[in-house]
Design a protein with these regions (language model features):
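Exposed, low-structure sequence patches enriched in small/polar residues
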Residues: 362, 370, 437, 442-737
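Structural preference for beta-rich elements and adjacent junctions enriched in aromatics
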Residues: 19-397, 402, 412
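A short, polar/proline- and glycine-enriched secondary-structure boundary/capping micro-motif
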Residues: 99-107, 145-148, 187-189, 297-299, ...
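Outer-membrane beta-barrel transmembrane domain signature of Gram-negative proteins
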Residues: 216-240, 380-435, 558-607, 621, ...
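Extended, well-ordered alpha-helical scaffold/bundle regions in very large, multi-domain proteins
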Residues: 285, 291, 299-302, 314-316, ...
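Alpha-helix capping and helix-loop boundary segments enriched in small/acidic/polar residues
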Residues: 263-264, 307, 357, 387-392, ...
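Bacterial Sec-dependent N-terminal signal peptides
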Residues: 1-25
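Extended, hydrophobic alpha-helical segments in both membrane/secreted and soluble proteins
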Residues: 248, 270-276, 284, 290, ...
Length: 737
């Protein structure tokens, strides 16, 4: 099998180098777009009927990126730009012959999913370094999506800038009107009379799953590749100055506990705290937080894990989400699972302010300083976590420095420190990213951990190579984690392991694709994973994920099948969902079938069923989700997961375990929303409720009313149910000085 894979890899590599003709380099002459200066502030209402808009110099020569790369779009798009001493204004007309009938928007969630919605977005590179971008996106209902991108690799999706957008819809299409304050943008100080910035516009028409751009890029890339961006010229921004944002909050809460040891039956509290954000200049930002609270953060979703390895729960707390990309370097799988499943992150913010079960631990104060420029990026963060009877007072520190090399490469270092009364854990890391050309890239890292308690030192490292074009994605990830490596403020999916995880995706859109009105591409793949125990060199896991059948549909739906022959050597027993499996060698084969519909429709679904052998028995798994969104103001999602064990483990266990949930989002508009979530897990007999009313009464100022409820089996008495109820009211106010 090893020789077969090597042969396939060599043959496909030869094919990719000899046949790929659709990847193109950035144009040496960048496409230009001119902004026009005005004196007055505009009324931002989505109509573009202020007389000043007639002074603008419109651009409409967009190019289609997907599916007909390089062709003239079937739907006209026009962009205009104005500016004054306070704002950069952008107006976009998105013509559509079907008018309102073609609009696809499923909900009003901020930072919405562009794969399920019409959208238009601006990528702005204020330093004009062709690497970094601030992205401002909206959909036909004026929902905001904004984030920061660095080398199209690290993304701060949860960065929330202060800006406005309004939209209107008509029988001829839809209009978006943006007003972005200069204080929100990051740009270099210049002595020139005018400035030119990197700039691109990306439009998605979801009904036909088409994508257009002002300055074109290959369809295997995205608009974040600023080396393909055009230029917006004629800008006269004010000199960058320091500005301060203060955001105090007031919170009152009521807590009730039943059958939980160490807790009062009832408790009430009033809490005051807040954050200060000081933009020292256009490059540097200092954030201060005191008596930090995350009551409005989404509750974690339960997961029934049947693998031997740790599940990475996403960070949901706003303070840690901002500038996460600077500190969050690491090696891990991409969203399409390319790169392999191995994950190494020297810093992972959920290790701060949360216990092992995800319950909050109070944070007294914290500070974060970040500076980004065309050449260097550096930052530091300090957090003081409050001590309690169950955990000592703990201090956390993380520092990061990286330097941009050449056009698209980077070298960096990171250090983390966790200090409490019993131990100090230190992790030091060096890492780099090299983009050899448009298709080839290499990401690597080396780090060492040390614990003063016991004087224990460990090491980890990884290198991840990618070759990505319109037709192929090929990767090889090599990783090593020693037995004693301990990133106390980080995350690893496995320990004491040497990982080898190559793979191939083939994206075929040629003339032999059948039923082209339905099928957009055929995408077979091969994902191979080998893991050896680092301390002994013994093979402990081997799997071949073979998918000869995978179809991407013109609608955005998909269907496919993956077969995965697997070898596992368990060095110790483990118990997935309470089913004990002894140590030893196991060979088994899993099959997975996937089917997903058009996610932009009013009713859509995703289903995958897994079946086959599992260690010494069988396991069938069903995952099903359905979205019902009759109008964008109302969306309801149901999810169901069932694991059926048959004669598995020491006791030949046969049982069903169900995990299901329902989530509803009800919005009067993008700024006033009620979100409810309920989840039940038959494995732990747990019921979780989360209901949150959110009103953004002015930009980035919120009123929240939150109710959380947890019911679960008591850990001390098996015949007793424990219960937690939390009712929270919180108001925050943002003031920009």
């Amino acid at each position: 099998m090893n020789y077969s894979f090597t042969l396939v890899l060599c043959l496909l590599s030869f094919c990719c180098f000899s046949q790929d003709v659709q990847l193109f380099k950035p144009d040496s002459v960048r496409k230009e777009f001119e902004a026009v200066k005005i004196l007055n502030n505009l009324k931002v209402d989505g109509h573009l009927n202020d007389k000043e808009w007639q002074l603008a110099k419109p651009k409409s020569d967009f190019i289609e990126v997907d599916p007909r790369q390089g062709e003239k779009p079937r739907h006209y798009t026009e962009i205009r730009a104005l500016f004054n001493q306070n704002y950069l204004y952008l107006g976009v007309f998105n013509r559509d012959t079907l008018g309102k009938k073609s609009v696809r928007v499923i909900d009003f969630k901020r930072d919405f999913n562009t794969r399920t919605s019409d959208f238009v977005g601006m990528s702005i590179d204020g330093f004009n370094d062709r690497r970094n971008a601030m992205v401002f996106t909206t959909n036909p209902h004026g929902v905001q999506r904004d984030f920061l991108s660095f080398d199209a690799t690290y993304i701060d999706l949860d960065w929330d800038g202060l800006w406005r957008v309004r939209t209107t819809r008509s029988d001829s299409g839809w209009v978006a009107e943006f007003a972005i304050p200069w204080k929100t943008l990051r740009y270099a100080k210049s002595d020139e009379a005018t400035q030119s910035w990197g700039f691109n516009v990306n439009r998605g028409r979801r009904m036909t799953n088409e994508n257009y751009a002002f300055s074109p890029f290959p369809r295997s890339f995205n608009v974040l590749r600023m080396d393909y961006a055009g230029i917006i010229k004629g800008l006269q921004p004010p000199p960058p100055t320091a500005n301060v944002r203060i955001q105090p909050y007031f919170l009152t809460s009521y807590d009730r506990y039943r059958q939980i040891d160490g807790r009062k039956p009832e408790d009430a509290a009033v809490k005051v705290g807040g954050e200060i954000k000081w933009a020292v200049n256009s490059r540097a930002v200092l954030d201060l937080t005191f008596n930090t609270d995350f009551a409005q953060a989404d509750a974690d979703r339960q997961v029934n894990n049947v693998t031997r390895f740790s599940v990475l729960f996403p960070e949901r707390r706003q303070f840690f989400l901002e500038n996460a990309s600077l500190f969050g370097i690491g090696i891990g799988p991409a969203s399409d699972m390319s790169g392999g499943t191995m994950r190494i992150q020297p810093f992972f913010s959920r290790q701060i302010g949360l216990d092992g079960a995800g319950n909050p631990i109070p944070i007294d104060a914290g500070a974060r300083f970040v500076s980004r420029s065309a050449k260097t990026n550096y930052g530091a963060m300090y957090i003081r976590q409050r001590g309690s009877a169950s955990s000592p007072l703990t201090n956390y520190f993380v520092g990061r420095y990286s330097e941009n090399l050449g056009k698209q490469s980077r070298l960096g270092a990171l250090v983390t420190v966790k200090n409490d009364s019993g131990n100090t854990n230190i992790v030091g890391n060096v890492d780099g990213f090299i983009r050899f050309d448009e298709a080839h890239s290499l990401n690597w890292m080396l780090n060492v951990s040390h614990d003063t308690k016991g004087n224990v030192t460990g090491a980890a490292g990884a290198a991840q190579y990618f070759y990505a074009t319109n037709q192929w994605k090929i990767w090889w990830t090599q990783s090593l984690i020693s037995k004693s490596y301990n990133p106390a403020v980080g995350f690893t999916s496995r320990s004491d392991v040497i990982g080898t995880t190559p793979g191939i995706f083939w994206f075929y859109r040629g003339k032999h694709v059948p039923f082209k009105k339905i099928i957009r591409s055929v995408e077979p793949s091969l994902l191979v994973e080998f893991y050896h125990q680092a301390s002994t060199g013994r093979l402990i896991e081997r799997s071949y994920g073979l998918s000869p059948f995978w179809l991407m549909l013109q609608s955005g739906g998909f269907m496919g099948h993956i077969m995965t022959p697997t070898y596992q050597y368990l060095t110790e027993p483990f118990s997935p969902l309470g089913v004990k499996i002894n140590a030893g060698s196991y060979n088994y084969t899993r099959h997975a079938v996937y089917w997903g519909s058009d996610g932009s429709k009013k009713v859509s679904f995703n289903w995958n069923g897994e079946y086959g052998t599992y260690y010494n028995g069988k396991l069938n798994t069903t995952n099903f989700s359905m979205l019902v969104a009759p109008i964008p103001h109302v969306s309801i999602t149901g999810r169901y997961n069932r694991n059926t064990f048959k004669n598995v483990g020491v006791n030949n266990t046969s049982k069903n375990i169900d995990l299901w949930s329902i989530e509803g989002r009800f919005a009067a508009n993008p700024r006033l929303q009620l979100i409810g979530f309920y989840q039940r897990n038959t494995d732990t007999q747990a019921n979780n409720y989360n209901i949150r009313l959110s009103w953004e009464y002015q930009p980035l100022s919120f009123i929240y009313i939150v109710f959380n409820k947890r019911e679960f089996q008591s850990t001390t008495r098996l015949d007793t149910r424990s219960q937690e109820d939390h009712l929270i009211a919180k108001i925050s106010y943002l003031r920009q000085l």
